[in-house]
Amino acid sequence: MVVKKPRPKKKPVTKKVAPAPLAVKKPVVKKVVNQLFEKRPKNFGIGQNVQPKRDLSRFVRWPKYIRVQRQKAVLQKRLKVPPPIHQFSQTLDKTTAVKLFKLLEKYRPESPLAKKLRLKKIAEAKAKGKDVEPKKKPSYVSAGTNTVTKLIEQKKAQLVVIAHDVDPLELVLFLPALCRKMGVPYCIVKGKARLGRLVRRKTCTTLALTTVDNNDKANFGKVLEAVKTNFNERHEEIRRHWGGGILGSKSLARISKLERAKARELAQKQG
């Protein structure tokens, strides 16, 4: 019987693409190194070269007031914050706040200089023998916790504005509940310093508007509506909403590591 020899397999022929006719290799220019200049690499080890400039703010010994405010901010994130305190972190939105402060600007208390000039004019008129008619007292914003509390209790306040960063917070902690009880619209805004500027002081905890001019009643009505929907009508939601309880990056990493270890153990037991 004749045994057939296996035929050798043909090798696949790969076609080479012809090079582009105008492709010319660029000559490599060698960098001329001056032998006079010796390379001296820096060593940034301990006790060696001067260290390069880095951001060392993490290692700065900050003043005590900065350390305290940072620790306070961290604690407020970590600890569980009860609703009466947590509500002070939810402030009035920017657009409504701008409208509100524009309105309050018109009812700033009289400056000492303006008062002096007004009284001087009245005195001069009286000295000349003219009859000075008593003008209607202009409506100003009322400031201070005690004054505002009295106005709320008497139901004279039309709007109460509370600062969110009062320290200690106990000074104004009861005001939102009192406003809700007496049916007075209230809002929490950013900055005791901003309120203080309105009443010509450094800081101010609370303001209250008792009367508004007829020209501003339309704008005041819109602001009141926004304030009521954001604060007074959201009472039940605010009452249930706790704050804080946010873990730091290290704690989260530790928890995730433990969970991974537990998952690995379970997999080994089942496998």
Swiss-Prot record:
Has UniProt tagged this entry with the keyword Translocase? no
- Looking at the Swiss-Prot or TrEMBL record, what is one Pfam family this protein matches? Ribosomal_L7Ae
Any one Gene Ontology molecular-function term assigned to this protein's record: RNA binding
Keywords (A to Z) from UniProt: Ribonucleoprotein, Ribosomal protein
Q: Which SUPFAM superfamilies does this one have?
A: L30e-like
Tell me the Gene Ontology biological-process terms attached to this UniProt entry.
cytoplasmic translation; maturation of LSU-rRNA
PROSITE patterns in the cross-refs: RIBOSOMAL_L7AE
Q: Which GO terms describe its cellular component?
A: cytosolic large ribosomal subunit; cytosolic ribosome
Name the InterPro entries on file: eL8/uL1-like, Ribosomal_eL30-like_sf, Ribosomal_eL8-like_CS, Ribosomal_eL8/eL30/eS12/Gad45, Ribosomal_eL8/Nhp2, Ribosomal_eL8_euk
Q: Which cysteines are joined by disulfide bonds?
A: none
* Entries under Gene3D superfamilies matching the protein: 3.30.1330.30
Q: Which domain of life is it from?
A: Eukaryota
Q: Which family does it belong to?
A: Belongs to the eukaryotic ribosomal protein eL8 family.
**Record-given protein name:** Large ribosomal subunit protein eL8
Gene expressing this chain: RpL7A
